[in-house]
């Protein structure tokens, strides 16, 4: 099942109110996110593919943990649940997701994703256009409401295999790259 979520008035009002408190310290961001794992209080994420039009990220969210209630004012985001069960909240509704369900969030839609499965959840996040610092947090159980995207100090560049890290280069025409795990398989063509 794929659900599409449109922006509502409450998203617009909340974003306008929060924009003035936004901390986007881009000086603490790497030149690129390739071969880095970003550590989060809820788990971790890493880039698996990027070109000038799209960035695709792999997220692992621990059981009972949740991302902040946040939005991306300038980019559309799609989430595909690879394994487990999740709850993706917006201002309008609670969206329960199971393995291979997806949600498409228009620009500036506030949302949070919580892992309901005891083994945590694996998620693919597709962002268009690529811009990791396009982030405004409304609520965060870890105290990051006024913070921008995690900086270099929250990024790992060594022992990436501990996180089952993978990255896809741009495939040649008719080529397909695949990453397989015991819980999922991801391909890019």
Indicate residue ranges for each PLM-predicted region.
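Short amphipathic
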Residues: 58-60
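Glycine- and acidic-residue-biased ligand/ion/polar-headgroup-sensing regions
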Residues: 62-64, 72-87, 91-92, 186-189
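A short, N-terminal "cap"/entry segment at the start of jelly-roll beta-barrel domains
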Residues: 1-55, 68, 135-188
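Asparagine-centered strand-capping/turn motif at beta-strand->loop junctions
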Residues: 112-117
């Amino acid at each position: 099942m794929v659900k599409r979520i449109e922006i509502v008035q409450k998203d617009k009002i909340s974003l306008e109110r929060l924009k003035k408190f936004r901390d986007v310290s881009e000086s603490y961001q790497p030149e690129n996110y390739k071969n880095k794992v970003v550590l989060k209080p809820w788990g971790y994420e890493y880039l698996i593919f990027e070109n000038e039009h799209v960035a695709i990220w792999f997220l692992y969210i621990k059981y009972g943990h949740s991302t902040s209630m946040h939005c991306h004012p300038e980019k559309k985001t799609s989430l595909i649940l690879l394994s487990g069960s999740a709850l993706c909240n917006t201002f309008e509704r609670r969206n329960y997701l199971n393995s291979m369900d997806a949600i498409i969030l228009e620009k500036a839609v506030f949302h949070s994703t919580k892992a309901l499965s005891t083994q945590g959840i694996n998620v693919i996040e597709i962002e268009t256009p690529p811009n990791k610092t396009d982030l405004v947090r409304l609520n965060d159980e870890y105290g990051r409401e006024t913070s921008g995207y995690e900086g270099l100090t929250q990024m790992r560049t060594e022992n990436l295999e501990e996180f089952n890290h993978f990255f896809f280069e741009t495939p040649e025409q008719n080529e397909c790259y695949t990453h397989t795990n015991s819980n999922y398989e991801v391909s890019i063509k």
